[in-house]
Structures are given as C-alpha cells and as structure tokens.
Amino acid sequence: MSELAYPYEAPASQALFDRAAAVTPGGVNSPVRAFRAVGGTPRFMVSGTGPYLTDADGREYVDLVCSWGPMILGHAHPEVIAAVQEAVARGTSFGTPAEGEVALAEAMVERVAPLEEVRLVSSGTEATMSAIRLARGFTRRTKVIKFAGCYHGHVDSLLAAAGSGVATFALPDTPGVTGAQASDTIVLPYNDLDAVHAAFAAHPGEIACVITEASPGNMGVVPPLPGFNQGLKDACAANGALFVSDEVMTGFRTSLAGWFGVEGVVPDLMTFGKVMGGGFPAAAFGGRADVMAHLAPAGPVYQAGTLSGNPVATAAGLAQLRLLDDAAYDTVDAVSAQIQALVTEALTKEGVAHTLQNASNMFSVFFTDRPVVNYEDAKAQESFRFTAFFHSLLANGVYLPPSSFESWFVSTAHDERAVQRIADALPAAARAAAEATA
C-alpha cells in the first residue's frame, strides 16, 4: 500500500488512555500494553471476531497478538462462547469443587503424558510461583536456576533478568524484590549447558530446581538448541534437583501436547496458562504424582486460591481444548509458515538485516543478521527498526505485539483475507524499517 489505511491519530483510544492514566498506574493493567517501547497511543479494543480486533475508533486490525497466545481459535469462537454462556447461566463462582475443573484436569492429563496430576490456579504467575514452592518443599532446598530472558510471571524470585515486559522496559531488576529473595536465584545465560553444570558444581546440594520456558517466547522467540532441554533434565536428575518446564506460552499452542509434544523431554513439573483458559484467567501446574503428593491437602506444601478452577474459565478452556485436534494445529502451523514467508520476502527485498525465528507456529523477527540464541543476542538487535515496522503495520491495519521482545501469534481463524491484508501491508512496513534511524 502506498498510503496509510487509517489516519495515524486514534482520538477515542487516546481519550480512554487519558481516563485510564488518571486512575491506573501508567494507564494500563500490564506494562507492555502502554506502547512505551514503540511510542504512540495504545489502542483500546472494543471487540474481537475471528482474526480481527476493532478499536474504540472503529478501526479493524488483523490480530497477530491473539491476546498474547490464548486465542488460538480466533476471537469469539461460537462454540467457546456457547460453553461460556451456558456456564455463566449456572453461576459464576461456587467456592466448592465442581465437575468442570475435574473435566479440564482430565483433558490436560490425557493430552500431556508427563502430567500425572495437575492443580488449577488463575494465572501463569501463580502456576510458576506454586511450582517453585513445591520444588523447594519436595527437595528441601532453596536455590533456583533460571535463565536470562526467560519470563515466568512476576514472581519476586524470578524477575531477575526476566523477559517480556521486563525486557521491553530494559529493567535489570525491579524495586520491591529483596536481596534475600534474589540471592536464592541463580541466573544463567540461556542455551548454555556448561554454565548449568558449573552452577551445580558451585552449589552442591543447594539447588531445588531448574526452571526454563520450554521454548522461550518472552525475549522474542529463541528456541532451545538441540539437546539443551534434555541436558537440563539430565543435570537435574544427576544432582537431585527437579526440572520445571514453563509451558504457560507453549502449552497447547505449539502442539496438542505443547512443547513436550514437539521435543519429548519429560519434566518433573510443568506450568500452563493462556490457551488452556480459552481467553479466561486459568492456569495450572502439575507433573510427577510423587511430587504433587506434597501439595496440600495431601501434603505439607500449602497452595490455595479463591477462584482456582472457576466454572466459567474451566468451561471456556475445556471447549477450546476439545476443538484443538490435529487438523486445527495443521491450520495454525500452515498460516504461521505463510506469514513468516511473507515477512521474510518483504524485509529481504528492502535489504533489511533480520533473523526470523520460530517455535512451531510461534515466531518473531529480530532486526539483526545473526542467529539469536540467548538474551544478549536479542538485546543486540536494532530495535528502532522494529518501531518503524510496527507503526507502519499498525497504520495499515495489522496489530503486532508492541515490543520487539515478544512472540507473534496466529489462529485457525486467520483466513486468506486476513493473510492478504498482511501481505498488502508488509512492503511499506519493510521500507519503513529500512529507512529507520536510531
């Protein structure tokens, strides 16, 4: 397109942002939504249908965020909506056990072999926080190994050198996390097994677990090198620690069994969120039955939540999981591959140095000509080119994550019309990236 599809101004969104800023810190309820990394007015959305979002100014966008991953069937899928409406009519929360939470747990255990038992919670942060507590309680050890650029929610002990919004805002750490909490976290370079072995040697009998994103998407998409996750599993087994695989992003997104289904490495504990909630606040952690047996009320490690296993959230999640068959993943993978090819073609034609990386249907573009294998590589890209690329696409009706440190997502609803709109918008975006200056 030679002209912008929409005026750049977004007055209705700006008015809402001004209202929000008066009552909410930074005007948003999750930092990356504020557009601080790219500038401009955050778009306030009023509806979503299939692969499209509509903002407060009435503009329609092809959505490549998909609510940061959960909307793998697209927005407002009729069968998910029907399940939610039916559940709401029965009541929104009971504070008791309910069949829906059992059915969702059964569906997860059926799909993911390492899940022998699972506990439902309400957010990915709760899931990773609880998994870490359980690992410490089971091993009676305190230290945790994590990797720079991997994000595991805003758990105090796991915010050191984290990805996602922490990477977007270039925060090395965050006030409010005490030195004592941070001292029990060992942060290592991602994809570096030698560093892992050295950490175990330096802290014999002290490390409770190693936690990693199964395939990271919070510093952009940086897949594990061949053998890395298996090496983590082996190192943990040799040293009496637990291997915790964070599948909040990849779970039920990268395959029917998440990243485990792609790679086959068996963790001791796993965490889930996003897709399993069908767009509602739902998450989980689970794994080996002997480890999960230490969780209250069966064991001494306490964890609880008023809205855990919420009947509306479990109805949405169960409906979505039941629709995710092999054909659905074939569709998502094919759409993702098609868009990746279009992005590569457009940037190559304009001579823009870039590296496109994917983990199954998750993908992102780094504005560098070098492979990205860790957080330092991700930070070395020319992010100013992403800013120009982002705003050109936004103005032409394509909504990307407003940060160069995030994964892009697609859905089964991204049809030929949606892909064509992306194709039409990419040449101008590639030119904008080529012409951008720091």
Curated annotation (Swiss-Prot):
Keywords: Cytoplasm, Isomerase, Porphyrin biosynthesis, Pyridoxal phosphate. It comes from the Bacteria. GO terms for cellular component: cytoplasm. It is an enzyme of class 5 (isomerase). It is found in: Cytoplasm. The keyword Mitochondrion does not apply. The modification N6-(pyridoxal phosphate)lysine is found at K274. Its cofactor is pyridoxal 5'-phosphate. InterPro entries: 4pyrrol_synth_GluAld_NH2Trfase, Aminotrans_3, Aminotrans_3_PPA_site, PyrdxlP-dep_Trfase, PyrdxlP-dep_Trfase_major, PyrdxlP-dep_Trfase_small. Pfam families: Aminotran_3. It catalyses: (S)-4-amino-5-oxopentanoate = 5-aminolevulinate. Coiled coil: none annotated. GO terms for biological process: protoporphyrinogen IX biosynthetic process. Its EC number is 5.4.3.8. CDD domains: OAT_like (cd00610). Homodimer. NCBIfam families: hemL (TIGR00713), PRK00062.1 (NF000818). This is Glutamate-1-semialdehyde 2,1-aminomutase. It comes from Streptomyces coelicolor (strain ATCC BAA-471 / A3(2) / M145).
